[in-house]
Amino acid sequence: MAEESLRTQVNKPSSAFIAVSWVALITGAAAYIIGLFNASMLLNEKGYYLILILYGLFAAVSLQKIVRDKLEGIQVTAIYFGLCWASIVICIALLAIGLWNASLELSEKGFYIMAFLLSLFGAVAVQKNIRDLDYLRTHTQPPSVPNYSNTQFQPIEHDEEKN
């Protein structure tokens, strides 16, 4: 029953939305990484921020997957669902704490926050598009057309006595 209700809700994502999702992911991640590479901070600080974006992207994709699994009626454990949400919150909190204590200009801090959030949004949107397209590919079949090419037709015999 959950599958039927989901089937009516899943629409094929438009090409524009697919493209914008990929652009958001690539732009956000590239801006964050380039900004990190060009930043004048210690190597261990750069490593901290690099791990945060990697952890954040994984947590965001995992959360999107688990929410979609629940919609499709796939059993999801409460502990994993909670861990996914906790990972997102922890990741954003660690970024906020790290930037609060960093000796960066306010504009740089804002840049990192925006690039980070754009990356997370892009990752979730790309994952959603992939999942939607896969669902539509596997759950919608084109109407079956009978193949009569090798069939030999037999004349139908009518019993006129039955009339």
What are these regions (language model features)?
Residues 17-26, 80-89:
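Select subsegments of transmembrane alpha-helices in polytopic membrane proteins
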Residues 119-135:
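Membrane-water interface at the C-terminal end of transmembrane alpha helices
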Residues 95-110:
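Membrane-helix boundary connector in multi-pass membrane proteins
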Residues 135-154:
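Short, highly charged, low-complexity non-transmembrane loops/tails of multi-pass membrane proteins
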Residues 14-17, 37-58, 80, 109-111:
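Transmembrane alpha-helix entry/boundary detector in multi-pass membrane proteins
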Residues 27-39, 94-97:
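Membrane-embedded alpha-helical segments in integral membrane proteins
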Residues 3-14, 73:
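Cytosolic juxtamembrane amphipathic/interface segments immediately preceding
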Residues 61-76:
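Membrane-helix boundary/interface segments in integral membrane proteins
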